[in-house]
């Protein structure tokens, strides 16, 4: 087995014969938290290198393989998928080719960077708070966070079993949809076109980089001319959302899924990741139970208020930051939280969400978010919007 040493990959896969199928000839990068038979699943961590090789493919990997895809290698990622910026001190940090010296975003960092460079055609990733959509925006590709229950996560190393979703990225929407059709289980999608989009007045539109704000504002008339109804108003469920200690989910649940590494070889874990995992000690069992109950209330309230409508936001409040700007912990934490802010909404409401690149502003994305089982509707809407953003 040859080893890829670029920061986009942690290891390459040996060539294999592939069956004919809907993804024949499609090169797929697999985020390094999905089991691939015969390879160690490191989840971007030196602490997992001692684990045995996977004995079988993760469900999503098996579906891609059966559809004729060519599996290229394990894509690099934030260790344990625990940040939205994509830094990895062990295997290198993937960068966006769109902005000199800027990061690719995370945690599906290597997949997005490899896509943007044309090394792969599809990146299989996960999204806990934006880990498909943030790097998609930063690298100028399309990232889909589907309804969590629509794609199996069996055989994928979890960060937060409450918020994790499995999904694809690609350079264009058509390829994302082909991959989603292969990966997703038959389900009763909610009917009705997604034509009414709400820009919330009480969430997601502050602290925007000038380039992001300008690109977003310029996109709205294009959507309206294409037949979308875009309304700026307050969403009441977001007032409840503001009360949620979102950090609880990944902090507490990562300590469950990575207990062996955290407790037995903590010195091998990225200090930035370890610090966030340590925050779980600040949440009691009662407090976390309250967080789960509040999240369930938010899901119900969002579904009731949005109905067949969707939320329209910039994918990320900021343009891709320079790697050099993230050296200090305080700066890293501030930028990480701002990067995750808009995308995390889709995970908390148990919805579906997609980021589309805005071609005129490298590193900026337009994001549609809707309640659960509106995946087909959001993909149909995105198909109408994608060409508008290429102008």
Which role does the model predict for each range below?
Residues 1-58, 81-83, 216:
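Short, well-ordered alpha-helical
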Residues 2, 62, 66, 70, ...:
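Structural helix-boundary/capping segments
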Residues 25-43, 248-299, 355-365:
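Short helix-loop capping/hinge segments that flank enzyme active sites or metal/cofactor-binding pockets
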Residues 28, 34, 182-246, 269-273, ...:
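Gly/Ser-rich, acidic/histidine-flanked active-site/gating loops
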Residues 48-55, 92-107, 332-339:
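Short pre-catalytic strand/loop immediately N-terminal to key active-site residues, enriched for Gly-Thr
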Residues 56, 100-112, 125-126, 130-131, ...:
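Gly/Ser-rich catalytic serine loop of serine hydrolases
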Residues 66, 289-391:
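Glycine-rich, small-residue loops and helix-cap segments
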Residues 212-234, 259-264, 287-308, 336:
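Acyltransferase
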């Amino acid at each position: 087995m040859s080893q890829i040493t670029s920061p986009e990959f942690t290891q390459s896969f040996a060539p294999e014969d592939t069956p004919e199928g809907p993804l024949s000839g499609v090169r797929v990068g697999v985020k390094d938290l999905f089991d691939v038979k015969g390879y160690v699943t490191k989840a971007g961590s030196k602490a997992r290198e001692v684990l045995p090789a996977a004995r079988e493919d993760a469900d999503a990997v098996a579906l891609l393989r059966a559809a004729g895809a060519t599996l290229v290698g394990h894509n690099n990622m934030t260790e344990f998928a625990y940040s939205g910026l994509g830094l990895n001190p062990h295997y290198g940090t993937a960068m966006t080719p769109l902005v000199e010296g800027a990061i690719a975003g995370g945690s599906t960092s290597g997949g997005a960077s490899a896509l943007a460079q044309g090394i792969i055609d599809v990146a299989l990733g996960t999204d806990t708070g934006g880990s498909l959509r943030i790097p998609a925006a930063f690298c100028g590709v399309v990232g889909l966070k589907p309804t969590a229950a629509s794609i199996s996560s069996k055989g994928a190393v979890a960060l937060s079993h409450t918020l994790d979703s499995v999904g694809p990225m690609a350079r264009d929407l058509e390829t994302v949809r082909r991959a989603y059709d292969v990966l997703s289980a038959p389900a009763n999608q909610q009917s009705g076109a997604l034509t009414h989009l709400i820009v919330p007045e009480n969430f997601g539109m502050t602290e925007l980089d000038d380039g992001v704000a300008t690109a977003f504002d310029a996109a709205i008339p294009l959507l309206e001319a294409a037949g979308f109804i875009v309304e700026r108003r307050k969403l009441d469920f977001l007032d409840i959302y503001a009360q949620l200690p979102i950090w609880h989910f990944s902090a507490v649940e990562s300590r469950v899924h990575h207990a062996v590494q955290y407790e037995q070889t903590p010195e091998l874990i990225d200090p930035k990741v370890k610090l966030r995992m340590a925050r779980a000690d600040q949440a009691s069992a009662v407090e976390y139970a309250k967080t789960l109950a509040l999240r369930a209330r938010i899901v119900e309230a969002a579904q009731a208020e949005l109905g067949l409508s969707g939320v329209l936001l910039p994918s990320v409040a900021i343009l891709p930051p320079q790697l050099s700007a993230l050296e200090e912990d305080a700066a890293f934490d501030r930028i990480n939280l701002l990067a995750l802010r808009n995308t995390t909404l889709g995970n908390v409401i148990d919805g579906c969400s997609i980021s589309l690149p805005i071609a005129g502003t490298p590193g900026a994305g337009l994001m549609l978010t809707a309640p659960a089982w509106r995946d087909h509707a959001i993909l149909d809407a995105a198909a109408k919007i994608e060409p508008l953003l290429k102008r």
